[in-house]
Design a protein with these regions (language model features):
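N-terminal, positively charged nucleic-acid-binding surface of large information/translation enzymes
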Residues: 1-203
Length: 204
């Protein structure tokens, strides 16, 4: 008997879950979890709603409610839908939970202490009118690859190309529609993969 940890891609909190969520990321891991249990293995199958990022913020803006309330509302809907489909999660949580925050901070602290976190400078779009940086879904514009006029700053849903906010043509704020935008440099923290690569490959 083996101990098996299984998870699936965490569904974004925005909106009601649909068959794409099921088929794309949840059913394959659920089938695998059931199979591993049938084979006599000790299985821990975990999942949860991804409540971080612009998806939840844009969704909350559209519904005119605080982000926390929006996440509470849709987490409950996700959880109920997955119960209705009889998915066999051992634990279905939330990225906003205190437990997840503590675990994430602990892992980050250990990586930082051991020199695996690197600081780098990036260029980001800043909205002068909104007084904020516009990450992925906070910015919309024309896709440079296919000309789709409602491409987001993370991906074009028309041609599926992955994008950076700075790639967009005629970019505008999703929040206000403002085109009064600037490119500014900001500092970010990254996992230093080249430094950890050898140990990671050996572990895998």
């Amino acid at each position: 008997m083996s101990k098996v940890l299984i998870t699936s891609a965490l569904p974004y909190i925005n909106g009601v879950p649909h068959l794409g969520h099921m088929v794309g990321c949840l059913l394959p891991s659920d089938v695998y979890a059931r199979y591993m249990r049938m084979m006599g293995n000790e299985v821990l199958y975990v999942c949860g709603t991804d409540e971080h990022g612009t998806a939840s913020e844009v969704g909350a803006l559209k519904e005119g409610m605080p982000v926390e309330e929006y996440c509470d509302k849709y987490h409950a809907r996700h959880a109920q839908t997955y119960r209705d489909f009889n998915l066999s999660f051992d634990y279905f949580g939330r990225t906003s939970s205190e437990q997840n925050k503590e675990i994430t901070y602990h892992i980050f602290s250990q990586l930082d202490k051991n020199g695996y976190i690197a600081e780098k400078t990036m260029k980001q779009i800043y909205s002068v009118d909104d007084k904020m940086f516009l990450a992925d879904r906070f910015i919309t514009g024309t896709c440079p690859h296919c000309g789709y006029e409602k491409a987001r700053g993370d991906q074009c849903e028309n041609c599926t190309k992955v994008l950076e906010p700075t790639d967009l043509i005629n970019a505008r704020s999703t929040i206000s529609g403002s085109t009064n935008l600037e490119v500014r440099e900001t500092k970010h923290l990254f996992l230093n993969l080249p430094k950890i690569e050898t140990k990671l490959v050996e572990w895998l």
